[in-house]
Amino acid sequence: MTSSKKPSNSSAKNENLYAIAETSGQQFWFEVDKYYDIDRLNAKEKDKITIDKILLIKDKDNISLGQPYVKNAKIELEVVSHKRDKKIIVYKMRPKKKTRRKMGHRQELTRVMVKSISITNSTPKTSSKTEVKKKSTSPKASNPEN
């Protein structure tokens, strides 16, 4: 006998909402109330950060695709902590020589949590444009003394 649980209302609401955004030279698939590790940001813990470079937003049945970015869209993030990634070993060696070099690198990361994904539908401002008439100019007469 199998039992299936229905998702709670809060998870079902956020289940259909996601955004693909560009930050730190990479593209991330952001969902609300999830943690992400991105390259180190100059922000303190508990600071709020806004990302405006949104490539795609999906909300239920609506998909907004940017060219290259979606206008009036933003993602609100909260900095949770700063940390360092696992060490990456770089080993260089020349065969048949006694040349070996072992180095390592740890990437500095910032852990962020997505607070909200939003798109605002602002109507473009209508302004009355006045037509500017060009004055017809006649070519200047050349100076015969030259």
Swiss-Prot record:
GO molecular function: rRNA binding; structural constituent of ribosome
Keywords, sorted A to Z: Ribonucleoprotein, Ribosomal protein, RNA-binding, rRNA-binding
GO cellular component terms, semicolon-separated: cytoplasm; ribonucleoprotein complex; ribosome
Organism listed in the record: Prochlorococcus marinus subsp. pastoris (strain CCMP1986 / NIES-2087 / MED4)
Similarity comment: family membership: Belongs to the bacterial ribosomal protein bL21 family.
Record region (Disordered): 96-146
Membrane-spanning residues: none
Keyword Calcium: no
InterPro entries, sorted: bL21-like, bL21-like_sf, Ribosomal_bL21, Ribosomal_bL21_CS
Entries under NCBIfam families matching the protein: L21 (TIGR00061)
Subunit structure: Part of the 50S ribosomal subunit. Contacts protein L20.
Function statement: This protein binds to 23S rRNA in the presence of protein L20.
Gene Ontology annotations of biological process type: translation
PROSITE patterns: RIBOSOMAL_L21
Protein name, UniProt field: Large ribosomal subunit protein bL21
Superkingdom, natural source: Bacteria
